[in-house]
């Protein structure tokens, strides 16, 4: 799997108002980008990736909108991996791995447990990267293709 996102030849950035309709728009944009990049919609990573993306955008809309009127999604792909990030301007950085026990049952019933179960189950990675000013973050997901 490619390790440097800068090396991924396909990229798309989408910024949306932090409102419920952002979830559907982010997902539909992902479907369009994947099709344009030649990634088969029946690839085993695509449906889980779309669910992960939907959960992350939902979390930004639900929990960060009070401080972040916009959510930005970065889509990227290469020959052997798919990556995306969801960025908002809320400073809270959720402990991604704390939401997942590795037993197939997350510690909670929330979206982050689902995100981590799907990501790790596909052999992917997840990381939270804080903004330099400490007032926002991006959650990056990378999945092998």
Locate predicted features:
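Phosphate/oxyanion-binding active-site loops and adjacent basic polyanion-contact surfaces
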Residues: 22-23
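Conserved beta-strand-loop-beta-strand hairpin that lines the nucleotide-binding pocket
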Residues: 1-17, 61-145
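Conserved short strand/loop->alpha-helix "switch" segment adjacent to the catalytic nucleotide/phosphoryl-transfer site
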Residues: 32-54, 103
């Amino acid at each position: 799997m490619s390790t440097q996102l800068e090396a991924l030849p396909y990229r798309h950035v989408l910024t949306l108002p932090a409102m419920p309709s952002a979830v559907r728009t982010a997902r539909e944009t992902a479907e369009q980008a994947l099709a344009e990049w030649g990634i088969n919609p029946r690839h085993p990573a695509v449906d889980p990736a779309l669910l992960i993306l939907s959960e992350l955008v939902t979390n930004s809309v639900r929990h960060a909108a009070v401080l972040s009127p916009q959510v930005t999604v970065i889509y990227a792909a290469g020959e052997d991996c798919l990556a995306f990030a969801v960025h908002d301007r809320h400073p809270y950085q959720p402990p991604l791995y704390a939401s997942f026990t590795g037993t197939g049952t997350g510690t909670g019933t929330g979206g982050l447990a689902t995100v981590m179960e799907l990501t790790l189950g596909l052999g992917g990675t997840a990381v939270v990267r804080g903004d330099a000013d400490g007032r926002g973050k991006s959650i990056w997901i990378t999945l092998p293709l």
